[in-house]
UniProtKB/Swiss-Prot annotation:
Gene (UniProt): gcvPA
Subunit structure, interactors included: The glycine cleavage system is composed of four proteins: P, T, L and H. In this organism, the P 'protein' is a heterodimer of two subunits.
GO biological process: glycine decarboxylation via glycine cleavage system; nucleoside metabolic process
Superkingdom assignment: Bacteria
Matches recorded under Pfam families: GDC-P
Record-stated family: Belongs to the GcvP family. N-terminal subunit subfamily.
Keywords per UniProt: Oxidoreductase
Function summary: The glycine cleavage system catalyzes the degradation of glycine. The P protein binds the alpha-amino group of glycine through its pyridoxal phosphate cofactor; CO(2) is released and the remaining methylamine moiety is then transferred to the lipoamide cofactor of the H protein.
Molecular functions (GO terms): glycine dehydrogenase (decarboxylating) activity
Protein name per UniProt: Probable glycine dehydrogenase (decarboxylating) subunit 1
Amino acid sequence: MRYLPLTPEDRADMLGVIGAETIDALFVDVPAVAYRKDPVDLPFHAGELEVEREMLALSRRNRSASEGPFFVGAGAYRHHVPATVDHIIQRSEFLTSYTPYQPEIAQGTLQVLFEFQTQVAALTGMEVANASLYDGSTATAEAVMMATRVTRRGKAVLSGGVHPHYVGTVETLAHAAGVATERLKAAIDAEDAVIAAIDADTACVVVQTPNVFGTATDVSKIAAAAQAAGALLIVVTTEAVSYGLLKSPGEMGADIVVAEGQSIGNGLNFGGPYVGLFACKEKYVRQAPGRLCGETVDADGRRGFVLTLSTREQHIRRDKATSNICTNSGLCALAFSIHMSLLGEKGLRQLALVNHHKAVKLRDALAAVPGVEVLTPRFFNEFAIKVPGNAAELVETLAANGVIGGVPFSRLDPGAGLDNVLLVAATETTPDSDIALFSKALSKVLAPKGSNQ
């Protein structure tokens, strides 16, 4: 079929119907500084081969996480993903953007979502989980919005241990929704400050464990304080593998649990897509965002799966919707579920133990470097260290020596005044030889000038 563009007469008729004189009148709301009327001066188009060469040249400027010692975490973690995961998710039945509106032709997809929800509920220690959200940060923002609906209050208290990017996402959505946010000062252990900030206007308290500094915390006291004030406790986790070793948020009294599920079944990538985990107490389920898959029986009594709750604007009136989450995280949720099924309960615990043991080895190696101070007392697979001078400059120097040595906290929160704090992580993909190389490189970089190190 040929593409037949609109004629000048067609455009004139359409503008006449809406009462506009010119096409430019349609863009009066766009600020003049952002509205470009002249054509963009782009280079002449290239062929497929030339474009491929150009993209390869650009990609060579990047450095893969597998190209050398790599200790980056801070919310996204390098883990081994079995080849089985990618093989299964590429089946045509799964590799689709189709939303399972019609259960009679989507039982496979619906069963996978049901199993995913079951796994997430078990991991988080909660009663019910939804069928995934975009990622951990947007799941956190959705949880805050949900808490304001449940409590009919308008303020969220955000712990100083919550990842700054998550805080930024919450603040963006909260501002648009008219919800006040109280962001506490960044702190390795923020329990006392969080409890002190709770008042009669607080809809929810948002805490993270392990937090952005790696601190693994029992949030039971915060849960008791929040609930005594009529607020909900939202617990955030950025490293889902930690569920295999640490006490679940549900056991500690959480009302809502959100997490980034990238660590299980999904590789590192810049910009996503990742998969947000969302679970809550059953009494709040009708205020939960996204979709929820349920089990039922058909007319012949056979077991089947359907979308039980879909409080999103594609399914119900926009003013009644609690979220506009769509299907883009479904494939990532499937990858999560496949990897979890391959691991099993014992496998996940073993994986978590390996991660912790690797981090302990890293902690011991770095603590022996003169000038380095380990700041995180209790951790899973990530911790913070204090270094002499500027951590961002140190990371650049380490990179020049072949080691990607973590994330400077100042890169996450430039205004926190923690320019000498470096976040480092180790997983099952970190060989002992890389830990030794990191320790050696750090000793060399921090050694006084003129020394023999």
